Amino acid sequence: MVKLDYRALGLKVGLEIHIQLDTGRKLFCHCKPELKNTEPDFRIIRRLRPAMSELSSIDPAALWEFRKMKTMMYEGFNDVTCLVELDEEPPHEPDEESLLLALAVSKVFNAKVFDEVYVMRKVVIDGSNVSGFQRTMVIAHDGLAEFLNYKVPIWTISLEEDAARRIEDKGDVTVYRLDRLGIPLIEVSTGPMEYPPNSIMEVAWLIGRTIMNTRRTKRGLGAIRQDLNISIAKGAKTEVKGVPELSLIPKVIEYEALRQVNLLKIKDELNNRGLSRESYTPDLIDVTSVFSSTKSSIVKRTINEGGIVAALKAPGLRGILGFELQPGRRFGSELADRVRAWTRLGGLMHSDELPGYGISKEEVAAVASRLGVDSFILLMGPQGVELQEAAKVIVDRIKEAFDGVPEETRAAKEDGTTYFMRPRPGAARMYPETDLRPIRITFELLAKADKYVPEPIDKQIERYTSMGMSRELARQLASSEYSIEAEELIKKYEDKVNPTLVASIFVNMIGGMGKNIEQLNIIQVVDKLLELYVNGRVTREAIQDTIQKYVEEGGRRGVEDIINEGGLWRMQYSEVASIVKSLINNGVKDKGKLMSIIMRDYRGRVDSRDVEKAINEFLSSEQKS
C-alpha cells in the first residue's frame, strides 16, 4: 500500500467521544440504568415517519431511514423501562448528578459553560429511539484540553440519552431492547486536528481516560464509543460512526484518507476521459434471457424465484468500477453500499469483476453486445420498484464521482475499512424540546460539580511515577479499567506493599485475561492475596499463579483452596535455608546457579529475598571456614 503524506494531504480529524455515565437513574426518567439479558416482560411494534421541523424542512438522513420502510419491535422490562421510553409520557426533569458530571468534565477541559442549557430533540428515525428523536443538551463549548504534548480544541460538551440496543434484524423488522434507552451519556466533540493517526488515537484515549477519572462512568462493551470526522484538503468531511476499539482508529483514518485520495483520482480520470454525468440514466434493460442456461448459482436462484436480471449502462467506466479505494473495497463496492442501504437488494455485479460468480465470458460478451457499451452493472431481484430504486441510487452515486468525495456518514468495520450508512444530517435535524424548561446554570450548581472534576490523565501518570512506578507501568495503569481499584489497594496497604507490585497485578496479571471482574469478584481476590503477602504467607509468584487459576475456574473456588491444592504457601526461612545447605553440600556453590535451581524447583513457594539471604549466609560461612 502507498504510504500517505498526511501533512501534504491536509488531513484533518475530529473526534466524538461518547461515554455512558454510571448514575442512579436514567437521564429523563427514574428507571434504573441497567442492561438486561433475561427474557423481556413485553414487546411493542412501531413504525416511524419523518415530519417537517418547525422550519418546514425534513432532515435528509431521517427521510433516508424512512424510505427503508422498516418496522420496529421494542423489547421492554418492567424494572428498567417506563412510559417515558415508550414515548407515552413526557420526560422528567434531567438527572442532576448527570448534569453535575457534564459540568465537571467541562471544567477539566476548560470549556465555556452556557448560562442556560436547553434540551434539544435530535431527529433519529433508525428506530433506536421510540420517539423518533434523541434528547441532548449542549452544556459547554470552546474549550481547550492540554495534556502531554497535545493541545486539543474542544468544540462542544453535551449530555444526552443513549439509544436503544439493536438486537437483531428479522427481514423488514428490526428488534431493539429498551434497557439502554435513556442511560446518560457525555459526548465530547473536538475541533479538527492535524495530528497523524497514531496521535489521534492517543488523544481519544486521553479524553476518554480523563472522563473515566470522574469515577462515575460505566464499563464494558459499548460503554465507550468513538466517532471520527475525517477530511483531506480536496476531499470532504466524512463521519465514521462506531469505531469499536481505540487501536482501530489509526487504521480507519488511514483507510478513509486513502479512500478520499482514490476518489479524487477517479474524478480526474472521469474528466480525462471526457465523460459527462448526463451520460448516466437509471434506465434498466432486462437481460434475463442471456442467462437462460447460466451456471451461476446466484443468477439461477433469482430466475427460479421469478426474478429478473437487469442491466444498467455504465459507459466509459471500464477500469473505474473495479478501481480499489481501500483494501478489498472498490468503486463498485461504493455503488453496492448504496443499493443495500436504500433497497432490500443484496448488492450488484459489475463488468470489471466479470467473468466471475459463475457468470461466463460468453454471457458477459452477450450483455455488452446487447447494451452497446464497454461497461455495465447487473442487478437481480423481483421486477418492480426495488430494481428501479437501485438503478436510481447507483446513477446518483456515479454522478457524485464527478465532484470527487461526497459528504456522508459511514460505519467502521473491524478491518478498518468503512461502508456507507446514510447521508450527512442537515440543520433541520435539531430543534428544541417542548416538554422541558431551560436549565439555568447557577453558581450553586457549578460549585456542586467541583467534587466530580476529574484528575487530568497526565497528572495521574506523574502521581504514579512519584510512587516509584516506571513511566510505562504508570501509563498502563492509568489506561487500565482497574486503576481505581488499584489505587484503593495501594492506599490500603501503604508502606506494606510496593505500589509497583499492586500496579503490575492489575496491568500484567489481570489486564489481559478478558474476564468480567465484577462477576469474578477479582478485586476481593487480589485484596485477600495482598493480605496474605503482607503477612508473609504467600510470594509474589504465588499471587500470579493463584489469580490465573481462579480466573480459569471462573471463580469456582476460594483463594485458600487454590493455594492448598497447588502447594503455594510460602516456605519458612528455615526450610529455604535447609534446601540451600543441601545443594551447597552437594557441590553447587555458584550463587547464580543456586538461585536459578531453587527459584525453578520451588517457584511460587519461596521468596527470592529469603533465597538470596540464605545463599549469602552459607557461602560466607563456608569461605570463612
Curated annotation (Swiss-Prot):
Record InterPro entries: Asn/Gln-tRNA_amidoTrfase_suB/E (IPR017959), Asn/Gln-tRNA_Trfase_suB/E_cat (IPR006075), Asn/Gln_tRNA_amidoTrase-B-like (IPR003789), GAD-like_sf (IPR004115), GAD_dom (IPR029351), GatB_C_1 (IPR042114), GatB_Yqey_C_2 (IPR023168), GatE (IPR004414)
Pfam families: GAD (PF02938), GatB_N (PF02934)
Protein's gene: gatE
Subunit structure: Heterodimer of GatD and GatE.
GO BP term, example: translation
GO cellular component entries: cytoplasm
Keyword Mitochondrion attached: no
Entry-linked PANTHER family: GLUTAMYL-TRNA GLN AMIDOTRANSFERASE SUBUNIT B MITOCHONDRIAL AND PROKARYOTIC PET112-RELATED, GLUTAMYL-TRNA(GLN) AMIDOTRANSFERASE SUBUNIT E
Record GO terms (molecular function): aminoacyl-tRNA ligase activity; ATP binding; glutaminyl-tRNA synthase (glutamine-hydrolyzing) activity
NCBIfam families noted in UniProt: gatE_arch, PRK04028.1
Protein's job: Allows the formation of correctly charged Gln-tRNA(Gln) through the transamidation of misacylated Glu-tRNA(Gln) in organisms which lack glutaminyl-tRNA synthetase. The reaction takes place in the presence of glutamine and ATP through an activated gamma-phospho-Glu-tRNA(Gln). The GatDE system is specific for glutamate and does not act on aspartate.
Family statement drawn from the similarity comment of this UniProt entry: Belongs to the GatB/GatE family. GatE subfamily.
Claim: Nucleus is one of the keywords in the record: no
Name assigned to this protein: Glutamyl-tRNA(Gln) amidotransferase subunit E
Listed EC numbers: 6.3.5.-
Keyword annotations: ATP-binding, Ligase, Nucleotide-binding, Protein biosynthesis
Highest taxon, organism lineage: Archaea
Catalytic activity annotation: L-glutamyl-tRNA(Gln) + L-glutamine + ATP + H2O = L-glutaminyl-tRNA(Gln) + L-glutamate + ADP + phosphate + H(+)
